[in-house]
């Protein structure tokens, strides 16, 4: 169980997150986090992993979540990465297993087998030795997901994983996330495309600095909850399938 009580976050004298209270069981679920630009979606994920110093209580398995980070894997936005760093696809993905096997230890046989399966499943075999600076947006996102899946985490936090990627990459990633869900993992995804929300998510957290709605995806897509969150009529936007936020 992730148990958040009265979370508040101030950044640069701005009240970014206000009185966030949530209880989320670890029971095999994909949850979308949606809201307008500046709503605090990315800040919520960063607060959970301790990158931002939010107040309030944040617990995982009845202990401070910041002391339980071995159970959590975080995938940042691609824009936050240093793509000029000289490292190839293989090394990026294998770095994900150190959380399990420990740093400065040789990659064991089981991890190598898992690595090669991820290469196949995410269509990365031909890119194994390419530098990350040579990859397209979709290829890079598949590499980041493969790296995350090398760990044996319980909770996966993904910040805008589908921005700027091709349809095939998006589908391959969703297949792997569904597999994680079927294993009982919890996946939280910051997302912006309303047209795919019901298809991708079991539940949706609508956020605009505070919780506007949290519940089944089909209910979250009702106009009264969307309008309350985005503060304008989003019906036409939903019909068009437009991207409406980027935070």
Identify the role of each PLM range.
Residues 218-247:
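ABC ATPase nucleotide-binding domains
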Residues 191-192:
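H-loop/switch region of ABC-family ATPase nucleotide-binding domains
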Residues 131-135, 139:
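Conserved ABC ATPase signature
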Residues 204-217:
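H-loop (His-switch) and adjacent beta-strand-loop-beta switch element
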Residues 109-127:
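Conserved ABC ATPase "signature" region
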Residues 156-160:
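Catalytic Walker B motif of ABC-type/P-loop ATPase nucleotide-binding domains
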Residues 56-68:
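Conserved ABC transporter NBD signature motif
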């Amino acid at each position: 169980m992730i148990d958040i009580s009265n979370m508040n976050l101030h950044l640069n004298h701005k009240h970014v997150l206000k009185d966030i209270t949530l209880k989320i069981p670890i029971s095999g679920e994909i949850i979308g986090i949606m809201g307008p630009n500046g709503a605090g979606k990315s800040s919520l994920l960063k607060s959970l992993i301790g990158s931002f110093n939010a107040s309030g209580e944040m617990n995982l398995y009845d202990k401070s979540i910041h002391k339980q980070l071995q159970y959590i894997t975080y995938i940042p936005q691609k824009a936050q990465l240093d793509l000029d760093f000289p490292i190839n696809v293989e090394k990026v993905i294998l770095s994900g297993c150190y959380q399990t096997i420990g740093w400065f230890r040789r990659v064991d046989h089981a991890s190598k087998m898992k690595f090669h399966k991820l290469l196949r499943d995410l269509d990365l075999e031909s890119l194994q030795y390419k530098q990350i600076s040579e990859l397209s947006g979709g290829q890079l996102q598949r590499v980041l997901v493969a790296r995350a899946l090398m760990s044996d985490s319980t909770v996966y936090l993904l910040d805008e994983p589908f921005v700027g990627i091709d349809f095939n990459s998006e589908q391959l990633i969703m297949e792997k996330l569904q597999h994680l869900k079927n294993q009982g993992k919890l996946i939280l995804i910051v997302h912006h495309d309303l047209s795919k929300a019901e298809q991708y998510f079991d539940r949706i957290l609508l956020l605009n600095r505070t919780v506007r709605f949290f519940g089944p995806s089909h209910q979250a897509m009702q106009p009264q909850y969307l309008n309350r969150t985005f503060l304008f009529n989003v019906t036409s936007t939903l019909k068009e399938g437009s991207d409406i936020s980027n935070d």
